[in-house]
Amino acid sequence: MSLTLSELQIRTLKQTLESSKIPFKSEVRLDILSSFKIGGICPVVVEPENSNQVLETLFIFHKSEIPWKILGGGSNLLISDHPDNFVTLRLSGKFKEFEYLEGGKFRIGSATNTTPTFRQISQLGYTGAEFLSTIPGWTGGAVIQNAGCYGGELFDLIQTVEFLRNNEIFVRSPSEIKHGYRFTEFLNEKDSIILGIEILLKEGNLEEIQTSLKDKRDRRNSSQPENKKSAGSVFKNPKIFLENGKEIKAWELIDQAGLRGQIKGGAQISPEHCNFIVNVGAATAADVNYLVELILDKVFQTTGIRLNREIEYFGDIP
């Protein structure tokens, strides 16, 4: 485990950020930034509001030898109980905006909230992104994981991705970015930062779009734990098909292993949808990780199939 940041490092960082007029917050409870409502206190959360401030922040981190991690909407994330050995970068300002360009094109900042953003875009009369209105979190995180559901995924709509890598800003098309089912090359690049995307949609019938939005929302609410503290699907579907063409789902394997409803501390494998782990009390990251490892072991013992995590870990988790 990494060493805790020193008081001198933190004090010097704050002074540098203040002189550079880069917004930040001190002693931030990360649990309130997480849909799991799990996470400890981070010494500093830096909130750059434009690309220049992002670049300057990264320069400060590098010069001061400050370890850092980027946090978005916190919806597909398990945050450490002790995030005190790094500072957190969280985009703000212009990154929270989206705008219509022309011909069905929209530019969307990476810190926009996916559910209201894509619902609002759909209600403007543009179709194709309705499924994204059911996915919580921020657009940047949705890009990194190529978020999707109900037969659609974000990279189906993307025209370009703007991102920062090695202190340089790039704009790339999907054909220039490795991506697949719940995967992009950004997942393995911890120093890359998504700044925004442009998507292309078609004009549609507003009444049909409203129906589609409602159908997808109802479908989600009927099949997933509603109003529960969770991080969504814990594991990716294994992409294994039966002879009749039916896809084997991760939740079916977990259920087959007899783990539905299993509890550890304040965390529980959801009785409603066992590919969800929910915080039913004062769950810790360690509680959740225990259940994650239990699922991995039991599913493999029962079926011979190795599941892969969909949720990401943020910081050191025992």
Curated annotation (Swiss-Prot):
Coiled coil: none annotated. Its main location: cytoplasm. The keyword Chloroplast does not apply. It comes from Leptospira borgpetersenii serovar Hardjo-bovis (strain JB197). Residues 213-229 have a biased composition (Basic and acidic residues). It catalyses: UDP-N-acetyl-alpha-D-muramate + NADP(+) = UDP-N-acetyl-3-O-(1-carboxyvinyl)-alpha-D-glucosamine + NADPH + H(+). Transmembrane segments: none annotated. Cell wall formation. This is UDP-N-acetylenolpyruvoylglucosamine reductase.
